[in-house]
Amino acid sequence: MNIAVAQFEPKDGDTSYNLSVIEKLTKKAKSKGADLISFHEMAITAYTFTKDLNLKELTELAETVPAGKSTQELIRISKSLDMPILAGLVEKEQGKIFNTYICVTKEGVIAKFRKLHPFINKHLTPGNEYCVFDLLGWKCGILICYDNNVIENVRATALLGAELIFAPHVTGCTPSKMPGRDYVDGTYWENRFKDPVSLRLQFDGPKGRRWLMRWLPARAYDNGVYYAFTNPIGYDGEHLKNGNSMIIDPYGEVLSEIKSFEDDITISKVTKDKIKWSGGWRYKNARRPELYRTILGKEHSSDTTPIWLTSNED
């Protein structure tokens, strides 16, 4: 199977524009032989700007799934190109609002996952279910951004049978207590055509890609799964994001990665033979859950708030 991952610079709240870019990149992926395409977290609506929305504004941005206009448009695009598409949006249902990621085909919505650890807006409700579904002969899972940082989520999704995990993100280039993490100054982006090397050093350094590579390949390797990582490029809200959408195999190797500063895609062929030959597959079979069943099940109060969203830093 040939899978495509995308990156693009979204416009805040402009679902028509964002869907037009999704259609353009899906056409590009189709023309280059991809069997499906995956976009980033809340690609249909944009993400970071929602941190400042009140309940009324967030509710107005949200749509129902599958009846909402954006989902129906995504289905139309998928049907016209005969290609599954995965993308994120803000969903509303029965008075609750979710950070949601969907997979659509010409038949309609075949999978829906709600972010387990939303933090960008206090009015978002966490999802409470994992998602593993069949797509083109593969068992696929979805974990949105921060969900992937909680390693139990990845292991649980793999244990439910996932062979390929879609990992839509809006991440990188934000401050942290970790040395080297910070925002990227906007002048680098403004000068990206005159001085692309300086911007690439910012995006690929500890603020962006180097941070990703500390943990992202390990999620694939430890669990013996493929990872389809997606991330916007350029501005999402007031923050620059480094893109670097990539496909990682069960050995933890990057198969392909987007290195441009443009709206773009990359495609890789994934094969099932690597899964059962991987270390992660063997490690899952070697588990002794009787040793840690009660440890993992202990009561715990979850705190998801990242440092860059806290108002009182030390």
Feature names for model-found ranges:
Residues 66-84, 139, 149-265:
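CN hydrolase (nitrilase-like) catalytic-core segments centered on the catalytic cysteine
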Residues 52-67:
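A charged helix-plus-loop insertion that forms the helical arch/lid used to bind
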Residues 141-163, 167-169, 274-314:
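Cysteine/selenocysteine-centered motifs that mediate thiol-based redox chemistry or coordinate metal-sulfur cofactors
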Residues 1-12, 100, 112-115, 132, ...:
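Active-site-proximal beta-strand elements of phosphoester/diester hydrolases
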Residues 87-89, 100-103, 131, 245-247, ...:
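Short beta-strand scaffold segments in enzyme catalytic cores
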Residues 3, 18, 26-56, 78, ...:
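Active-site beta-strand/loop signature of hydrolases that rely on acidic residues for catalysis
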Residues 109-110, 254:
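Hydrophobic "anchor" residues
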Residues 115-129, 262-280:
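A short, polar/charged loop-to-alpha-helix boundary motif
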